Regions:
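Conserved AdoMet
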Residues: 1-38
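Conserved SAM/SAH cofactor-binding pocket of Class I
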Residues: 28-129, 156
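Conserved beta-strand segments that form the floor/walls of ligand-binding pockets within enzyme
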Residues: 17, 61, 75, 142, ...
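Mobile active-site "lid"/loop adjacent to the S-adenosyl-L-methionine
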Residues: 121-153
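Conserved Class I SAM-dependent methyltransferase catalytic core
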Residues: 147-211
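Extracellular beta-rich repeat passengers
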Residues: 67-69, 210-213
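Conserved beta-strand segments of alpha/beta enzyme cores
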Residues: 15, 70, 94-96, 193-196
Length: 213
């Protein structure tokens, strides 16, 4: 694709380096960032964790838009974090990067007011619906999950939220439109309330927000 060849793309008014190790930021992700900024008091100190940061686009834009935010960004990929660090520097923001898998990461002393994630959620069985450009040029690690456990990463984030998300804290996700109700039910059945689905510009349920009780 054009952006892969030129190793650069535009997201939320800013330039980002991309390569084969990170997903190319998409319009739906801009919508997710906009939703967060609509609901958050951008003048108050706030601590944010972006899980599966990839190019760093979500974390970096939130750091740029929320002056008093303390932003952390996690990814399992060393190569992706290298790109994200370059993007943070190029955009003039401070983001604390964590190299870890959310499936294994544990901390007893890190607490966040907002957790945001665009985790892998495309089932292997949905590959045939994907564009060849995506399949050939973007990291499968960041895209696909097993057909038998497609909510794996959401379940892991629920678990870590027991400790690491503050009371009244918010979570924001991109989700699989075909698993929207299942994803909503996952959060509604735990310690989250006010679970909301949000449609993207194509009227597909692609985002979810919930508040910790």
């Amino acid at each position: 694709p054009y952006t892969t060849l030129f190793r650069s793309t535009f997201f939320f008014g800013s330039d980002f380096i991309v390569d084969k190790h990170v997903l190319i930021p998409r319009p739906e992700t801009e919508e997710l960032v906009s939703w967060i900024l609509e609901k958050v008091d951008t003048k108050q100190p706030i601590k944010i964790l972006d899980i599966g940061t990839g190019s760093g686009c979500i974390a970096i834009i939130l750091a740029k838009q929320i002056a008093q935010a303390e932003v952390y960004a996690m990814d399992v990929s060393t190569a992706a974090l290298s790109i994200a660090k370059k993007n943070a520097e190029a955009n003039g923001v401070v983001v604390q990067f964590i190299e870890a898998s959310i499936l294994e990461w544990q901390s007893q002393d890190m607490f966040f007011d907002i957790i945001v994630s665009n985790p892998p959620y495309v089932r292997e069985s949905e590959k045939e619906m994907m564009s060849p450009n995506v399949l050939n040029y973007e990291p499968h690690l960041a895209l696909f999950v097993d057909n038998n456990n497609p909510l794996l990463f959401y379940k892991a984030i629920v678990e870590m939220s027991k400790i690491n998300l503050t009371s009244e804290g918010l979570i924001y996700f991109e989700i699989n439109e075909y698993l929207a109700e299942e994803t909503k039910s996952l959060f509604s059945s735990t310690f989250f309330e006010s679970v909301q689905l949000k449609k993207d510009i194509f009227s597909k349920n692609r985002m979810l927000c919930a508040r910790k009780c």
